[in-house]
Every structure is written in C-alpha cells, then in structure tokens.
Regions:
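Surface-exposed binding/hinge segments that line
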Residues: 87, 131-176, 524
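N-terminal lobe/hinge region of extracytoplasmic solute-binding protein
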Residues: 39-89, 120, 191
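Local pocket/hinge segments that shape ligand/substrate recognition
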Residues: 41, 162, 221, 252-358, ...
Length: 561
C-alpha cells in the first residue's frame, strides 16, 4: 500500500503544478469546435509525406493514401475500402475488384493501373515492400476496375495483412519521379484518395484538412472533424495538463497514473476499469541462445517461471496493461489459434520454487554459499538484461525482473544503453537478455508474431527481422512458413498448436505483458469515442495505423456542442 500512497501523493503534486504553472504554446487559428487535436505519434517536426518511407509523417497513410481494405483488429473484420471485393479464384490467383467513381485529390480518376503501378514500382526499385516479389509472379489490370495477382508461391497469411497495409499511390504523379528520388523526395503536397489533405506543417504540429469531396462520404459517411491537428510529443506532465484542460482531445501517449485521475477529469479509455487500455503488442524477454547459459533450454524455462508478471503489470504500469498468456497471443485474429491444452501442458506461471528446481536439476547451484548460483562448471553466473535508456516503464520492468532473479539466486543486472547502442547490440547478438516487441503488434494473423519471435533470418552478419536471441530451429521455421502458405483451416490449427508447443518447450523468449494502445480521450469537444462496448473503430494515430480503425473513429465521433 505504501507504493500506491506515494504514487497518489506524487500525482496530486504533479496535477497541482501542471494546472497552476504549466503553459503550453498552443494557439489554434482554427475553429476549435471543428478541430480534433491529437498527440502521441510524432517525435519530431513533420518532414516527409513520402508513403514509401515507413516512418513518414503519421497520417500520410490513411488520411491521404488509402489501402484496398481496412481492418478492425478488435472485431477481426475486414472492410472493403478502395476495393469493393477480393477473392482467391484459384490456389495462386487473387482477383481484386475496385470501387468506381473514386478520384485522386487533383481530380484524376483512380483505377486499376494505379494498383498495378504501386506493385510494379516495388519490383523495379528497392523499397520496403519489394520482398513481396519473392513470392508474387505478376499483377495485371484486366480492365479499369479489376486487378489479377498471380503468385509463384502464395503466402496467404501475409497477403491477408497486405490487403490493409499497402497504400495505393497515383501512377500519374509517381511515374514522373526519377528512381533515385523515390525515397528522398519529401512529397510535401501528397496527392491521395483519402478523406484529408495536408494543410500546414509546423515545428510542433501537423495540420490536416478534411477533403469534402472524398469518395467515401457516400459509402461510409463524412469524417466529423474539419481539421485534425497532430502535435509533436511533449512531456507526460504537459500532455496530462492539456488533457485536463481540454486542449487535447485524443492522447496516444503512455501516461503513467492516468487511471487515477480519469474519473476526476472525465477522461475516457477503452475499458472503464483495469486494464483501461486495449492491448497493442507483446513484450517479450529475449535470451541470447548463442551465449551460456541461455543456450540451455532448462535454464530458459527456469527464467519463464522466475518472472513475476503481476508485479510488472501492477507496480510498473498500475494496471494499465494485461499480463501475457504463455503463448504471447492476444486479440481475436490470434487467439482463434490459441491451443489451451498446449498451454495447460507446457505453459508457465510465476513459480520461484519451480524455477529453483529446474536450475538445480540442470546444475546451477550455489556452491560457495554466497547467495548466488554458479554455472554447472563452477564459473560465476552473472548476466545483464538491457532496454533502451529513457524508456522508463521498461527500465522499471527489468528492475523488477532483476529482483525476481535475485530471489532465486541469479544475478541479472539491468543495463540501459542509449537507443542507438541498444539497436547495435541486438542486431549483433551482443547481449544476454533484452525486452523487445518487434512484429508483435496486433494484426490479422499470428504468422506475424511467430515470424518475429522465431524468424529464420539469423545467419547473416546481423539480425534485423526479430528472433533477437538467434534461436535456431529449422523444423519450427518450416512449420511457420507452412502456416503462411496453406489455406485449409484445419491444417492451420494443427500447425498453430505445434508451433505453440515448440515455443513453450524451448522457450527462446518469454512473453511477459501486452503494452497498451495508449489512448486517453476528452469529451469537451468530441464524444462517442469507440470503447469495449462499441468497438466500431480504434482511436490510434500512431504511424500508418489509421487503417486499423482510426478513419472509422473520425467518421463516428460526434461534436459535443
């Protein structure tokens, strides 16, 4: 109780200081009643609207450029977007039927040639989605509104995600850009088909203006806000103050302690009570299997039983997140493949006694009586667990893990390199343990998750596609690939069970908690936010995630006045 008393006192002092003294340089020259103000996505001034760059200005994808489908990860439902339908017409051919009467912002007609061009560009140039041509054979326009994709090796799971992740670009504009400028061109006046256009970019914000001629007005309804202002991230105290004063409508920032003031200031969250936030990804503890003792399966399983996930959930996050189940899977699209029997037989839970037993059986004992276990050969057993410096919640989490390790006689020291050094170390297997979330974000298929935690690309000079601990299991890699390349649902369920079983037995990484889709809303200017009882959309302004329910949110929120 002391922890919570101190936290309450700290939050009270913060609120007093924020409300009394903080001043935010935020002067809108726009009609506030028609403007939605968001934050949490931008970490610096907007500088590029080039959709071929994954970290382009948030909103470029979704507000300006649009995908063929949108996807609601809460409902596990696809909504036809630029496409009106799509289907596999054979094992290796997919036909996409496009909507008619869609125009680009400059008035040019959108048609099948734009879709073909979007993919052909990735075949002829090196862009981030070019690897699709490793398994795609051709893409052809059969008429103005029909596109046929032919695959040399169909990747059904990946294609299901491709349908809502790929933003279509206008051929008549991008075909004029030289190949050597495709990535360097900032595209300051982006021309898309979407519901908003770029109005103004400043050092502290990006302003989008509604496209009142958007084709989707007649199909989905017109977005309610005339303007959307996305603010560059400020400190947690400033963001909290802006929320409490109604200067901010939607915050996608992680705000420690927000659950303690949400009722007082009328803040809305996805859940009314704990965990408050919708789960967004899985945080795992990776172990470097190329180093001792992490190369020992018995030791890795002991680490799984060692960690008190509830301490992380409650003491670090104050109940804002959920503990992960042993498989790491969550959400409708993934949990449909979760095998409860496998979890029952091979899963784990916090049990320091079990962890100690596993260590003793494997020869990790305290020979000299100093309170710390040694390696089976008698060498000292001292490890480090790293997270990036400044990631305060993760830093607290690994301190908690370190305390859990001490309880069972294992010395694991928290290590906080700066973000660039952290990346260098994980890419080069230069660590003992680390926390990571790569490719664990909620999606339509658990293939994404497995292809991240057990990616097969581990034998090059660097590891850049997940599986940071270089866990090497060719048989498992083959099963994950098979899951990607079959359509039969019964076969997929069988493979999913086998994959989960192998990961739980070998335990190359330990799923710990689900980071939240941090989302706090106010109702001074806008109401009818989506929530657990009305999940019509998802209030997320991060990156290019607007196709995951943010556009539907913009359409369905209502003016408070």
């Amino acid at each position: 109780m002391k922890f919570y008393s101190k936290l309450s006192l700290f939050l009270t002092l913060v609120l007093v200081l924020v409300l009394a003294f903080s001043t935010v340089s935020f002067a809108l020259e726009l009609d506030r009643d028609k403007t939605l103000v968001v934050s949490g996505a931008m970490w610096g001034p907007p500088s590029t609207w080039n959709i071929l760059i994954p970290n382009c200005t948030p909103g470029t994808g979704g507000l300006v450029y649009e995908p063929m489908f949108s996807y609601n990860p809460v409902k596990d439902e696809y909504t036809p977007w630029l496409a009106k339908s799509g289907e596999w017409v054979s094992d290796d051919e997919y036909v996409l039927n496009l909507r008619e009467n869609i125009n680009w912002h400059d008035g040019e007609e959108f048609n099948a040639e734009d879709v073909v061009f979007t993919y052909e560009l990735a075949k002829e140039n090196d862009v981030f989605y070019s690897p699709i041509w490793n398994w795609m054979e051709s893409v052809k326009a059969e008429d103005n509104y029909t596109v046929r994709f032919t695959f040399s090796e169909p990747h059904y799971a990946e294609w299901n995600a491709e349908l809502y992740e790929r933003y279509i670009i206008p051929e008549h504009i991008w075909s004029e850009i030289p190949s050597d400028q495709l990535i360097t061109n900032a595209m300051k006046d982006p021309v898309g088909t979407g519901p908003y256009t770029a109005k103004e970019a400043g050092q502290d914000r990006m302003v989008w203006e509604r496209n009142d001629d958007w084709w989707g007005n007649d199909v989905f309804g017109q977005p309610t806000p005339k303007y959307l202002v996305d603010l560059v991230n400020q400190s947690n105290n400033i963001v909290m103050g802006m929320l409490m004063k109604g200067e901010l409508d939607l915050s996608n920032n992680f705000i420690p302690g927000v659950q303690r003031v949400k009722k007082q200031f009328g803040l809305k969250t996805w859940y009314e009570e704990e965990p408050y936030m919708l789960s967004w990804n899985t945080a795992l503890m990776y172990m470097n299997t190329t180093r001792e003792p992490m190369d020992d399966t018995q030791f890795r399983r002991a680490m799984a039983f060692m960690v008190n996930k509830d301490n992380i959930v409650n003491k670090v996050y104050g109940g804002l997140v959920k503990p992960s189940n042993p498989t790491g899977l969550f959400g409708e699209g993934w949990e449909s493949y979760l095998d409860e029997e496998v979890v029952e037989d091979y899963g784990f839970e916090y049990n320091p006694t079990k962890a100690k037993g596993l260590l003793i059986d494997a020869g990790y004992v305290d020979e000299d009586g100093d309170g710390w276990r040694e390696m089976p050969n008698g060498d000292p057993l001292e490890l480090k667990i790293m997270v990036p410096s400044g990631w305060t919640d993760w830093m607290s989490a690994v301190r908690s893990i370190s305390a859990d390790a001490e309880e069972i006689g294992i010395k694991i020291t928290p290590d906080f390199p700066d973000s660039s050094l952290f990346d260098n170390r994980r890419f080069n297997k230069n660590f003992d343990m680390m926390i990571g979330v790569f490719q664990t974000t909620l999606s339509s298929t658990p293939f994404d998750y497995w292809n991240g935690v057990a990616n097969s690309s581990i034998h090059g000079e660097q590891i850049t596609n997940g599986n940071w601990g270089a866990y090497d299991n060719p048989e498992l890699f083959k099963k994950i690939d098979q899951f990607n390349m079959i359509k039969d649902e019964e076969e997929k369920q069988e493979l999913a069970s086998e994959i989960q079983k192998t990961l739980l037995i070998d335990m190359p990484s330990v799923p710990l908690w689900h980071n939240g889709l941090w989302a706090q809303q106010t109702t001074q200017y806008w109401t009818n936010w989506p929530n657990e009882n009305d999940p019509y959309g998802v209030p997320v302004s991060w990156g290019n995630a607007y196709q995951l329910g943010m556009i539907e949110t913009l359409i369905n929120i209502e003016p408070a006045k």
